[in-house]
């Protein structure tokens, strides 16, 4: 395995670790509605950071975006909005299926859809079937799916042991939402694929290869922001017991604390895709769709490890922790299989 591929896998791991940790600051926010908290974090992660970093990277910000016609920008934006729909459904999936089953099904579906649909769309799925490296990377995808399933099972055992139940368990509704979430969340993978002309244009301007994907985030995350912020603002305006005015009528120190914590959560959310771009840049071009598989499987891996570090599994017993450990090992094996496949 080459150093470039190894570093690509490593940066995807760092990005996934940030994704697994980003909600921790949000949990410290007090006396705010979820909608206000999510909006403040989202404004930082989907608007302020992408625009600021792109302005720093590009020699002429407006000229860069002005060179693309609508046929290039619209698919990138719409795939970003597609991801935004999946993001909203993610929380609803947890409500009706519970954390472990919801995450397992949604992540499993988005891993498969986001990874395998891209080569199908590009018309090069035969690379996966008819080359040795392609078959090995395909094997890695399915091994990762097994690892996600094992970690999901560990979570179910933990929830059963600790008496944790879904907020409003509804199998039919939950499964439907999990499928919608899984499919629509893959929009981020499709957006990165559609944004290749933007990446190439950034490279032509002399932007470092590690950073060429970052300017496209202005458009991708703009689509996601439209859906997420629109959802939050509509709820804040329509739902009786929600009020942004009330949220900002708290004591000044608490408001400042909540803003800073929400902004930190937004920063950590953004960093997952900052390092995703670094990892993506190191993956061989013919296998660039494997970035999504690495990100999502490492997200599950890091989520389990973060849970152990934060002692969320302390009272779960030995068996759930053993099953979790097995799932994490399987995901690590899957990443190595994919890495070897890309190198062959």
Curated annotation (Swiss-Prot):
Reactions the enzyme catalyzes: L-rhamnopyranose(in) + H(+)(in) = L-rhamnopyranose(out) + H(+)(out)
UniProt cross-references to InterPro entries, sorted A to Z: L-rhamnose-proton_sym_RhaT
Cellular component, GO annotation: plasma membrane
Molecular function GO labels: rhamnose transmembrane transporter activity; symporter activity
Protein keywords: Cell inner membrane, Cell membrane, Membrane, Sugar transport, Symport, Transmembrane, Transmembrane helix, Transport
Subcellular location: Cell inner membrane
A Pfam family reported for this protein in Swiss-Prot or TrEMBL: RhaT
UniProt topology in membrane: Multi-pass membrane protein
Residue intervals passing through the bilayer: 4-24, 38-58, 68-88, 101-121, 137-157, 175-195, 214-234, 259-279, 290-310, 321-341
Protein family per UniProt: Belongs to the L-rhamnose transporter (TC 2.A.7.6) family.
Function in brief: Uptake of L-rhamnose across the cytoplasmic membrane with the concomitant transport of protons into the cell (symport system).
Protein name: L-rhamnose-proton symporter
């Amino acid at each position: 395995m080459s150093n470039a591929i190894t570093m690509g896998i490593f940066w995807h791991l760092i990005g996934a670790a940030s994704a697994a940790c980003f909600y921790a600051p949000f949990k410290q926010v007090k006396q705010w509605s979820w909608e206000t908290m999510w909006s403040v974090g989202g404004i930082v992660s989907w608007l302020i950071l992408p625009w600021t970093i792109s302005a720093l990277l590009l020699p002429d910000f407006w000229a860069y975006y002005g060179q693309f016609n609508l046929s290039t920008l619209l698919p990138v934006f719409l795939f970003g909005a597609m991801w935004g729909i999946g993001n909203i459904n993610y929380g609803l999936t947890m409500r009706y299926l519970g954390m472990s089953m919801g995450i397992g099904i949604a992540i499993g579906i988005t891993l498969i859809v986001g990874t395998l649909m891209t080569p199908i769309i590009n018309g090069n799925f035969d690379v996966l079937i008819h080359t040795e490296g392609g078959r090995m990377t395909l094997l890695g995808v399915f091994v990762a799916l097994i690892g996600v399933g094992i970690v999901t099972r560990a979570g179910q055992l933990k929830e059963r042991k600790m008496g944790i139940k879904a907020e409003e368990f509804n199998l039919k509704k939950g499964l439907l939402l999990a499928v919608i979430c899984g499919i629509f969340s893959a929009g981020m993978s499709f957006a990165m694929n559609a944004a290749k002309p933007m990446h190439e244009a950034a490279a032509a301007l002399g932007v470092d290869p590690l950073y060429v994907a970052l300017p496209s985030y202005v458009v991708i995350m703009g689509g996601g922001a439209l859906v997420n912020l629109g959802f939050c603002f509509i709820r804040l305006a329509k739902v009786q017991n929600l009020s942004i005015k009330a949220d900002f009528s708290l004591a000044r120190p608490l408001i400042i604390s909540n803003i800073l914590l929400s902004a930190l959560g937004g920063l950590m959310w953004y960093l997952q895709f900052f390092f995703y771009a670094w990892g993506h840049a190191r993956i061989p071009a013919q296998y660039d769709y494997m970035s999504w598989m690495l990100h999502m499987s490492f997200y599950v891996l890091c989520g389990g490890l973060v849970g152990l570090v934060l002692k969320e599994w302390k009272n779960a017993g030995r068996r759930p922790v053993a099953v979790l450990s097995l799932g994490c090992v399987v995901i690590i094996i899957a990443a190595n299989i994919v890495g070897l496949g890309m190198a062959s």
